Structures are given as structure tokens and as C-alpha cells.
């Protein structure tokens, strides 16, 4: 998630906003501690691209609606955005759809990262197949310690500037909001009620995975948001809590 590996000034410039000191939104990169996979295993995964380059991840909510992170859509116009779906590779294959419009959560705050969620409407509808499928939104949070998976084309380590061509995934375990904010971990009061965490030793999402899916029990439970470094000890990855933000996603998808 947002990792501490790029100069803060560069990130602020790229994203057009500010973030807490040491807590950086994930830019281009790769899953840490994970494995290569294929899109058929994560058919809801998309690559959100700016001017043809991978920028963030996202999840297919319906044939023409994508769920991603609000910080992925700061200071950008829909005209330079596109989505690649149905491909294991962010740079080729599958189908490419232009972005018609998008909306960030009105309560999104780039300083605290609360409400870090957004909805994208595509210019054309996706045709569902074995490699393009929608994923349901969680209606409640999984139990602390529940198994989950996060996927994306994010960096393999903190500070890496290389982007893998093939989709990566990693298995992690849910860390509840209360547990993530406890003294067990290092975030404290930075964990808010619109966030959920996930962690596993030496495993995490990293720059470039932002906006992508955290899936548990076959439903979307989180949207990759931020964190301290990539797979740093005592700092789980932090995600927008889909169960908490579900009603906003549903209403926005119907109105955007």
C-alpha cells in the first residue's frame, strides 16, 4: 500500500495532494512476497491506466462500473484514463475501455486517507467471460485472522521502480480495525472507521497495487489504500473498508 519509498514531494506532485508523513499512496509496482498468477484466478481485477501506463488497480463491480481508490484519481481528467480488463498482463491482451466519468468519495481526505474509495463509469460495457467477472461487495467484515488475497501489478519491494508485466497475488490475513489500531501495531489513531487491515509475514501489497482488490470469502472486502513501507514489520497494509463504504458505492454506481 502507500509505501515509504518514494520522495514525498514526487508523490504529492504525482497525486496532486498531500499524505501523512511517511505514509505514501502506492504508485507503479508489484506485490511483495507473492506469486505470479493469471487473470482467470482474479477475473475482477483491472489495470487503471493514465495515458496508457499502469497507474492503479481496481475491481469490476458491474459491466460498466469499476471500484478503485480515491487517491488514484487525484488531479486527473477522465479523458486520459482507460481500463484494461480480462488480461494477465497490464500492457497487452484483454479489452481496453475508456473512462467516461468517475467520482471520489466526498469525504475522502488525502491527509488522513479516510474514505479512500472511488467509482468509475466506463464509456462502454465489458462483456463478461471466464477472464472478466464482477465481484460482490462485502456486507460485513471477515473475522480477525481470516484468510484473504490481494492482487495487482505493484512493486516487489519498497523503493522499486520496476513494474511487472504479469499479475501478482499474495495471501494475507485480515487484521480488524480495532486490532490494527491497537498497540500491537504501529499506526494507533491513524486507523479510522473506514479502514481495514491485512498482513502476513513478509507479504503485502506495494506501490502500483493501490485501488486493487482485497478479497476474502469470495467478496470484495477492501480496496488497497495505504501503509508504512511494503511488508514492514508491525505495519499491516491498510485498505478502504468495503463493508463500511458499501452503501456509498452502490448509490454512486447508480447515479454517476
UniProtKB/Swiss-Prot annotation:
This is Trypsin alpha. The record marks 204 as: Required for specificity. Gene3D superfamilies: Trypsin-like serine proteases (2.40.10.10). GO terms for cellular component: extracellular region. Its EC number is 3.4.21.4. It holds the Pfam family Trypsin. Residues 23-30 form a propeptide. PANTHER family: AT26814P-RELATED (PTHR24276:SF91), POLYSERASE-RELATED (PTHR24276). One of its GO terms (molecular function) is serine-type endopeptidase activity. Residues 31-254 form the Peptidase S1 domain. The active site is at residues 71, 116, 210. Residues 1-22 form the signal peptide. It is found in: Secreted, Extracellular space. Belongs to the peptidase S1 family.
